[in-house]
């Protein structure tokens, strides 16, 4: 049996002796420090293998016995092979340059001399001296000379010669120098250490709070950020400013020129938003006409929106103090009942409403909640934009209108438009025509100021700006209009159960109707360049009973 095994056994090459390894088959193989330990490990491995193997493996075990002495020689070779760092050895470029400079008699070399030393004394660069294959390693040498502080450059005395490279006598650092950054509160090493200690102390002293205890708008407590730890840091204000202004929707503020005329505290109040979700309230606005600030008692739109019930609800929850504040908002002039007329068509462009009210609030800028116009015909902004003395009563749903017995003739307190129209003579006043069959006031509104929506479409009556005209009793509205307009306007104003247009409904006004017509004509009609009363769009077709040619379409523009 043993003779058969010897006959099939192959002679083992001493250079490729079999290596024993543990049964776990780990890689790389463990390298024993001592030959004795390796012999013991080999013996243990062979003995362990012989216990598990059959008689054939036991017979081959003596043949593998001479391997341990060879394994002792292989161990150190592998260890040296794995420690190689670069293709030419374990030295770096900086080490090679240092050796080249130290080998020179003057301890200095030019760049070309360093190249020559590399090709001559380093075996790896012997065949890489030509220009095609030397671009890479020569570039690396130049970089190392520039980056390391151990090398210094000395200007050559001769003209047209390259500089000398020498070793730094002070002994510079090896390796690349880190990039320098400007020291600040955020990246300085000293401040970073202080910041870390301060944050730990602050976290230890902070009481634990649950998210349920915090108010609704407060942030949830969590780990302190860098901006929260250092409030004085310049970078810490960016997130705070963003959170403070993230919900601010617009930039509708008073002009800086107007705010500069106020006191310092008033200017700050005028420039600050009333809330993050709305524009500044009318209380902080400036009156363009009188140059005075609006009273602070005016209600804000957010407070008016709820009790007024914009979606068709009632006004049962409207506080009495709100009505009293609106009546007293304009001081003794409003209580005396002497509202003056100011007629700027810009008011109709800013949401309808109008132009008949105190001049302090006529040209207010466009207020928020303007999008209600898209859903409701008679918008809340139209009624609340100028904030006249009769604005809040005008917002209330009117009582059911009683049938009127006759046309609008001889009623006390009629519009004094006749005096205003007398300054601009037109066609002669036509005699009053008999009333046509009653038409709906909503179908043919005659409005001095164009409203975007029909009056009363949402249950809110538009403001009675026409009622601000005071005049002598007994004046006729139809006499105030030019001839064709007076004849055509007689139809919709006839008697019937329908309501009058909001511009002509005198029941909506509860104040006095006194006014100086001459001051109106001199101050407002003459000075205004944008006055344009256009009745073409509001005229109904002439009644069939009227004789004569139809009136021509024309616009009445004062000169």
Curated annotation (Swiss-Prot):
UniProt gene name: Foxo6
Residues with the Phosphoserine modification: 184
Span list, region Disordered: 1-77, 163-183, 197-232, 534-559
Protein name: Forkhead box protein O6
Tissue: Expressed in brain in areas of the nucleus accumbens, cingulate cortex, parts of the amygdala and in the hippocampus.
Main function: Transcriptional activator.
GO cellular component, one term: nucleus
Composition skew (Pro residues), residue ranges: 213-222, 539-553
InterPro entries: FH_FOXO6, Fork_head_dom, FOXO-TAD, FOXO_KIX-bd, TF_fork_head_CS_2, WH-like_DNA-bd_sf, WH_DNA-bd_sf
Entry's Gene Ontology molecular function annotations: DNA-binding transcription factor activity, RNA polymerase II-specific; sequence-specific DNA binding
Description of post-translational modifications: Phosphorylation of Ser-184 is be important in regulating the transacriptional activity.
Pfam family, one: Forkhead
Location in or out of the cell: Cytoplasm; Nucleus
Keywords, ordered alphabetically: Activator, Cytoplasm, DNA-binding, Nucleus, Phosphoprotein, Transcription, Transcription regulation
Residues of the DNA-binding region: 88-182
Top-level taxon of the source organism: Eukaryota
An annotated GO BP: positive regulation of dendritic spine development
Main location: cytoplasm
């Amino acid at each position: 049996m043993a003779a058969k095994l010897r006959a099939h056994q192959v002679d083992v090459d001493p250079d490729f002796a079999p290596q024993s390894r543990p049964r776990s088959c780990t890689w790389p193989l463990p390298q024993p420090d001592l030959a004795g330990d390796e012999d013991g490990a080999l013996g243990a491995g062979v003995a362990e293998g012989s216990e598990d193997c059959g008689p054939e493996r036991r017979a081959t075990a003596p043949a593998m016995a001479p391997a341990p002495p060879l394994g002792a020689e292989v161990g150190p070779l592998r260890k040296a092979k794995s420690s190689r760092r670069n293709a030419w050895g374990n030295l770096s470029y900086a080490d090679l340059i240092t050796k080249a400079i130290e080998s020179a008699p003057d301890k200095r070399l030019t760049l070309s001399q360093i190249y020559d030393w590399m090709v001559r004394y380093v075996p790896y660069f012997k065949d890489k001296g030509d220009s095609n294959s030397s671009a890479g390693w020569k570039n690396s040498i130049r970089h190392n000379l520039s980056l390391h502080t151990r090398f210094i450059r000395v200007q050559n005395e001769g003209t047209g010669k390259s500089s000398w490279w020498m070793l730094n006598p002070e002994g510079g650092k090896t390796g690349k120098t880190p990039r320098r950054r400007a020291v600040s509160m955020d990246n300085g090493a000293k401040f970073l250490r202080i910041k870390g200690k301060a944050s730990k102390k602050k976290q230890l002293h902070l009481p634990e709070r649950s998210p349920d205890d915090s108010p609704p708008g407060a942030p949830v407590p969590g780990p302190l950020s860098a901006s929260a730890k250092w409030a004085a840091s310049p970078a810490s204000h960016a997130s705070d400013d963003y959170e403070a202004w993230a919900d601010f929707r617009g930039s509708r503020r008073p002009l800086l020129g107007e705010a500069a005329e106020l006191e310092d505290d008033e200017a700050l109040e005028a420039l600050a938003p009333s809330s993050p979700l709305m524009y500044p309230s009318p209380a902080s606005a400036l009156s363009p006409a009188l140059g005075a600030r609006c009273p602070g008692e005016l209600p804000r739109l957010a407070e008016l929106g709820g009790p007024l019930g914009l979606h068709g609800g009632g006004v049962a929850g409207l506080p009495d103090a709100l009505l009293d504040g609106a009546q007293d908002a304009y001081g003794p002039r409003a209580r005396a009942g002497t509202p003056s007329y100011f007629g700027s068509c810009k008011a109709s462009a800013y949401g309808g409403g109008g132009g008949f009210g105190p001049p302090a609030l006529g040209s207010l800028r466009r207020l928020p909640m303007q999008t209600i116009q898209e859903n409701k015909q008679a918008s809340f902004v139209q009624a609340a934009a100028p904030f006249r003395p009769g604005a809040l009563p005008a917002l209330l749903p009117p009582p059911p209108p009683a049938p009127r017995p006759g046309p609008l003739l001889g009623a006390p307190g009629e519009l004094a438009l006749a005096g205003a129209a007398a300054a601009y003579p037109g066609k002669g006043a036509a005699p009053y025509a008999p009333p046509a069959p009653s038409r709906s006031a909503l179908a043919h509104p005659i409005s001095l100021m164009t409203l975007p929506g029909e009056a009363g479409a949402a249950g809110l009556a538009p403001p009675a700006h026409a009622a601000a005209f005071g005049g002598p009793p007994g004046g006729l509205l139809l006499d105030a209009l030019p001839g064709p307009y007076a004849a055509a306007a007689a139809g919709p104003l006839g008697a019937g159960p329908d309501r009058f247009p909001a511009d002509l409904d005198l029941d909506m006004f509860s104040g006095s109707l006194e006014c100086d017509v001459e001051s109106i004509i001199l101050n407002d009609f003459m000075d205004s360049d944008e006055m344009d009363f256009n009745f073409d769009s509001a005229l109904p077709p002439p009644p069939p009973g009227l004789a004569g040619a139809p009136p021509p379409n024309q616009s009445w523009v004062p000169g």
